[in-house]
Amino acid sequence: VESIALFFRVKCLGIDVLAGDIAKPWTDGNFGIIEINAGPGVFMHLAPAIGSAIDVPGLIMASHFKTPEYSRIPIIAGNNISKNLSDAIFNKIREINKDISYACLLEDGVHFNNDFFNKNDSHYQNVKIILRNPETEFAVLRHSKNDIYDFGFLHEGADIVILDNAEFAEESMKNLLLENGILIVISDHQIEVTRKDEVLSSISFYNEEDKEILIMSTIEPLLKEIINL
């Protein structure tokens, strides 16, 4: 089944079969495939004309996402994420997994795998373009104070939050942090890194270039951890 799904580039498919005993391998005989569906329906299982309902959607979700950690994509959120920092993150995660699909929302718009895609006037639409794309496997999202006032965040959870001299509204991004999430707070010329209110490090910097190098050095060891959850 996995080989067939891979061939058609689908995540889930349905196979209708006739079998003497569905518990036995198809190689034992008395087994025939009637139809393969790339977009299987589930309503007939939830509300069958005869017999009891079977939670097929639940079984499908459990097969793809065995624990809650697997049910979401890694997200880095921040109020002032630059193109240079995004490029550095992209390059690093491609070192970890060369096939991962990367999406980011920066001041100039939406990028997929480091290529500019589009900038919608609506922050809501830009975030939706990224999170509704079935290819997105890692997202970096920039939320400014005006975006937050007008639209909110439009997603639940963040593995890393980067607050760079944040305004009051932008500081509410702290509420997005997952239980083991990392908070990076930049104030004046100081970078403080915390996890669960415990300060992990505090570093000084002297210019923008140094700042982004230090941020990246903080993020790098975490990327493999959150990608491989």
Locations of regions flagged by a protein language model:
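ATP-dependent carboxylate activation and anion-phosphoryl transfer catalytic cores
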Residues: 1-79
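ATP-dependent carboxylate-amine ligase catalytic core
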Residues: 75, 81, 90-182, 186-228
